[in-house]
A protein has these predicted regions:
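Loop-to-transmembrane boundary segments
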Residues: 14-33, 74, 107-115, 167-180
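Alpha-helical transmembrane segments of polytopic membrane proteins
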Residues: 27, 70-86, 137-148, 174-177, ...
Length: 272
């Protein structure tokens, strides 16, 4: 089974699973989980930062204050409420579209998935900045974040597929020294500012500030692997009959019983 047929099978199976019950039960729950995963990290660390250092609350001793510029880049709470409604509205639209075009439905879900993943990436990126006390390092991370987004645009424009694995041994050695240096730097800062108390805890906490590097690499790899799927689905969506006949799908399997194409096919069959 080639990649195109695999994407077609996933698209048709996803289209078959769309129903009215899921639109009012699973879709809101899924949207809520997305909001929880994007809203909670930022606000947890922001509240701890605004509370100041309180010995009774361990988290307050781990976070730092962001600059006014960084705070202005944090989306307001209303954004996450809008995102919840937007996701729910999108899935309702996908349900309607799935009744006549399953391929397009799956294509749109993949696009929405990428958008949500970028928002998730940004949310966790900002949250982790609260664990980085040095402004200079945060500036470097901000530059890296912007460059990663520019690279994503480059991937879309050039239609670059996942031809390179950033976690292979070739790239592993290049990033290992950088990651090790940053980890030791963060660990040294924690020891200098907090002393030798909770030695193991600060050893593990030193890993958190370098996690944006792993987030960025994972995002790029995930994005590149999905570019091929988006290209395949877009090509199939533009020439559905060609691919349906080429891969041997029936009209019912491809469009569904409630589709206009299937109903017209049944009418023509009865006239014969």
């Amino acid at each position: 089974m080639d990649k195109i047929q695999k994407d077609i099978n996933e698209a048709l199976e996803t289209g078959r699973r769309f129903n009215i019950l899921k639109m009012f039960s699973v879709a809101p729950l899924f949207s809520f989980m997305i909001i929880l995963g994007t809203y909670y990290p930022i606000n947890l660390f922001r509240m701890a930062s605004e509370a100041g250092r309180d010995p009774a609350v361990p988290l307050t001793s781990m976070v730092t204050q962001l600059t006014s510029v960084e705070n202005s880049l944090i989306p307001p709470n209303s954004f996450f409420g809008f995102l919840f409604l937007f996701c729910w509205f999108c899935y309702i639209c996908f349900y309607v579209i799935s009744k006549r075009n399953r391929i397009k439905t799956y294509l749109l879900t993949q696009v929405l998935q990428l958008i949500l993943f970028i928002i998730f990436y940004y949310s966790w990126f900002v949250a982790i900045l609260y664990l980085i006390p040095l402004v200079a390092i945060r500036i470097v991370y901000w530059i890296g974040f912007v460059l990663s987004l520019i690279y994503l645009v480059y991937i879309l424009v050039t239609k670059q597929s996942a031809s390179k694995d950033y976690f292979s041994s070739e790239y592993y050695k290049k990033f290992l020294n950088v990651i090790l240096f940053l980890w030791l730097l963060m660990y040294g800062i924690n020891l200098f500012t907090n002393g030798l108390n909770h030695f193991l805890a600060y050893l593990l906490l030193a890993l958190l500030p370098i996690s944006p590097i792993f987030l960025g690499l994972f995002l790029v790899s995930f994005f590149k692997s999905n570019v091929v799927t988006l290209e395949n689905l877009n090509a199939v969506n533009k020439n559905q009959e060609k691919y349906r006949e080429e891969y041997g799908y029936t009209i019912e399997e491809w469009y569904g019983k409630k589709s206009k194409m299937y109903k017209e096919h049944v009418k023509k069959s009865k006239k014969r």
